[in-house]
């Protein structure tokens, strides 16, 4: 819970980045601060692992180091999101407004590059971490991690990008965000009845209120477009999942194991990066709602093999073609894995397009919070569906109905939002 708190109050960091320059800088200075905090976290973890930091117990040092890493990451993430909206000019050299389609396409390509960099970094760390851990001790591995903030510092030195937008600090966002974080922490630690529902309701109320504050100065047409954009993003991200029942079933009935699931995850991650690169043109040049529509359709179609496996599809394919459940799962993971990554591009493009001058970091942070709240809505739906279709370890009689229900909801809700509001964004 503690490590998720900085992400929960991300709008606080966004407000600071938007309105509080440090040494005259609202971008580069915060990147340096984030890098410094990250470096401190690495040093604390190295000291805890190596035993040369003794001012606190090792477990407390690990928590402190991890918290510093998260804070540094959040600060740099907030700045990067704001800069991703600023790098594309909205006006040509003559001062005329550029065509919206061109701006959207370029913003989309920026998001593609950002996601590619993030995915490549995750794959690189996953590949190197095990190898480094086999050669060096833990303290040395953490010290090698100082390369990461060093790259940020080099970027600040080489690229002198800076915003000239200035506005006063909005204490409603800053104070409200901190109070919101405290309330979420109290609900999470206090074992309150219906705690998840309470957190969801409070989050929606706070985020929607802050979005109204941030967009208050915009014209009515733009505010309506932002509202419809928010509804589409929420609907697309709020799809329920099956829960643990299907995973248990694959272990108990199909006899999948940890090694096979590791292969599935590695295959999915690599193919997601490749698909993001291959489909970058379609993701950025077609309309956002068109891309989201077809991604929702594809997600539904690619859910069918999982349903088929439950009803014996693998037995038929084994008899007819010679390949069974593992082959179907591997092919399905390879084809379905890019969808989550691909769907982020049009969603982030919509957010970047409507980022308001002077509120870019705060806006992006609030919309990221909205997407996270949508995931909570999906988790609540998952919980309720599992109460209707009860699936326990070893009792999978209702798993088929649960799979069908989640697939239908995952299709109808986003498609309905796109059909109703897609033409207005």
What does each of the following model-derived ranges do?
Residues 49-64, 75, 87-242, 256, ...:
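Intracellular loop-helix junctions on the cytosolic face of multi-pass helical membrane proteins
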